Amino acid sequence: MTFYDHTAIEPKWQAFWADNHTFKTGTDASKPKFYALDMFPYPSGAGLHVGHPEGYTATDILSRFKRAQGHNVLHPMGWDAFGLPAEQYAMDTGNDPAEFTAENIANFKRQINALGFSYDWDREVNTTDPNYYKWTQWIFTKLYEKGLAYEAEVPVNWVEELGTAIANEEVLPDGTSERGGYPVVRKPMRQWMLKITAYAERLLEDLEEVDWPESIKDMQRNWIGKSTGANVTFKVKDTDKDFTVFTTRPDTLFGATYAVLAPEHALVDAITTADQAEAVADYKRQASLKSDLARTDLAKEKTGVWTGSYAINPVNGKEMPVWIADYVLASYGTGAIMAVPAHDERDWEFAKQFNLDIIPVLEGGNVEEAAFTEDGLHINSGFLDGLDKASAIAKMVEWLEAEGVGNEKVTYRLRDWLFSRQRYWGEPIPIIHWEDGTSTAVPESELPLVLPVTKDIRPSGTGESPLANVTDWLEVTREDGVKGRRETNTMPQWAGSSWYYLRYIDPHNTEKLADEELLKQWLPVDIYVGGAEHAVLHLLYARFWHKVLYDLGVVPTKEPFQKLFNQGMILGTSYRDSRGALVATDKVEKRDGSFFHVETGEELEQAPAKMSKSLKNVVNPDDVVEQYGADTLRVYEMFMGPLDASIAWSEEGLEGSRKFLDRVYRLITTKEITEENSGALDKVYNETVKAVTEQVDQMKFNTAIAQLMVFVNAANKEDKLFSDYAKGFVQLIAPFAPHLGEELWQALTASGESISYVPWPSYDESKLVENDVEIVVQIKGKVKAKLVVAKDLSREELQEVALANEKVQAEIAGKDIIKVIAVPNKLVNIVIK
């Protein structure tokens, strides 16, 4: 049996593509464009895993398909290379994070090239390259000029032992840091913020203009969290102080019996009475030790302290005690709520715990037993009595505005983006703070502001980043002699990934972020493929920056990514014992088709789980490429199932894909190729061209491969293979298995040219229709012959053909034919005597 040698074929064609710049982006203005984008990876020390190539293979198939269809294709790759792991490694080993990052990138690039992806490497970007982050910094200066980047004192998660603030995501549920397990305290610190809230409505509205999965759009809508309601102002009794509450249910104001402020609310100290001061101070201290997540947990016991003061309910003049409680966050809404315990579960639990009034204002339910949270007509509500929800809200807003104690208000759950990190390995923020109290952005002519190389990258311990220790970089003097200090915080990893898709369009431009004409030519991105875990943050931040750049006239489109596709996760093979605990693969043995624990002998159940080092079920693509070849890996990952499904890795499936490619190789290299078309494969060939073309376009790669298999099976039944069909088939399989595609194309054509730009095959609609039909001939009700005849033969012609058949003639010899019943396209029934 003939098998192809992937170890010879694959490196040969990879070298050919590199030497000939086969995938250089086309610039012929008369052609349509296609921009296929992968979410670029963080180049970790671990290298690629088999999950990465799934999305990369999908965009690569589309890119190869569109090139063959005559498009200019932009298909680039780069590196999201700033980030904590490199910094941590550098701190642990004393090495420069830049060196570690460069080594990782080289390894990733080697692995990616071994998989045969058609990237235009002339457009490679690296977020840690000063020539790249010059423009990240330039965007920041534009945000600063527009008032969209500002400094604010905000509560952060401070870890004294690490000497830095950490993100909410890095705080464990027990209130300690993910790294090191140290105590985390909430502490106000000067931070850079980006005013993403200024774009909330547009970020919401423009989701209608993009072709994204509805689930991702919903996640963004929920994150933005638009609410329509009213602001209500409450005066504090016997003071000149007041506070504002936002509520989506101003119609329930008659049922508001107490108010709650966040412990951090600016008014707390001013309105706390002397006899409550100690309890309030103690409670504030306790609250600062909890994360926002822990504070707002619905299941937790309600805690709070009375300030000693009362607010006046503006609609009925009643006194409402003012409490502080940690379930109200200073960063959400106004940091104050009016509590309507009869109709809100959390307020009801709080009121029951602290013996506060509960007054029902909606009909229905028994508020002594539980909060009534459904809709009902208004009661105990003065001028709102008898009204439904919508009418009552409108009437109350009208009253609030007429009385000057409130107004209609739209709010968003979205918070401004905390943009600074007390870290070394990130883009320096291009701002100088002068001793006269002013701050200015570094002028464009002095960008990039290069990250200084330093061995001392441990946190400074002062709340500033390690850059505070690099005094010769830090301290500057203006021409007029005024001294200043550079901003020491760096940007988060999100910064470089918020605009990288723009730089691919014009990666070597030293004068501007990218040329306007080129941006006009290539935007928006036609297909963006990546994991659903980036649904909110990365995609929201990129959309925000894009809209700012649109307002500045830099980009010509409102949205960056026209179509988004989330590939599923490739799960590892894992095993569970009877308790449901996962067992590492090196502790499992297979006997007679079942799996057993090596140490206990217990029979185990096979179950898919996320690949992890601890389960020892991570599959390295290098091993797969070595054993089976890159084309096999590509075909297998596309054939596993729908691209958006999460599916378990299977060695058997991999072997099946390799066997299929061997059959393809044998078909083209050992079957006699002829210039004469017998017509036997007309239908299946044209069906295959049609199906593969449509299914690749719809990203249904698994069904496209299934149709290629149908063709191979049909072609193997024939003695010869028509040359045009052989070539067309090789073109169809080439985007999936590009190395094999190139090899077989040369075997058929000896052209010396890559298959990449050979026009995509077309199909003949007329050949999709069956021209022949099989009919049965029955004698005395028994089938005696089956005939293939032209479709739609008349009764007379059908009868003639049937009676002329040798088998039929042998059956009727010497017999009397009483009648012949012919049913076109179905059967002939002969009645004899």
Curated annotation (Swiss-Prot):
ATP binds at K613. GO terms for biological process: leucyl-tRNA aminoacylation. Its EC number is 6.1.1.4. It catalyses: tRNA(Leu) + L-leucine + ATP = L-leucyl-tRNA(Leu) + AMP + diphosphate. GO terms for cellular component: cytosol. Disulfide bonds: none annotated. PROSITE patterns: AA_TRNA_LIGASE_I (PS00178). It is found in: Cytoplasm. Pfam families: Anticodon_1, tRNA-synt_1, tRNA-synt_1_2, tRNA-synt_1g. One of its GO terms (molecular function) is aminoacyl-tRNA deacylase activity. It is an enzyme of class 6 (ligase). It comes from the Bacteria. A motif ('HIGH' region) lies at residues 41-52. Signal peptide: none annotated. InterPro entries: aa-tRNA-synth_I_CS (IPR001412), aa-tRNA-synth_Ia (IPR002300), Leu-tRNA-ligase (IPR002302), Leu_tRNA-synth_edit (IPR025709), M/V/L/I-tRNA-synth_anticd-bd (IPR013155), Methionyl/Leucyl_tRNA_Synth (IPR015413), Rossmann-like_a/b/a_fold (IPR014729), tRNAsynth_Ia_anticodon-bd (IPR009080). The keyword Ligase applies. Keywords: Aminoacyl-tRNA synthetase, ATP-binding, Cytoplasm, Ligase, Nucleotide-binding, Protein biosynthesis. A motif ('KMSKS' region) lies at residues 610-614. Belongs to the class-I aminoacyl-tRNA synthetase family. HAMAP family: Leu_tRNA_synth_B (MF_00049_B). This is Leucine--tRNA ligase. The lineage of its organism: Bacteria, Bacillati, Bacillota, Bacilli, Lactobacillales. The gene is leuS.
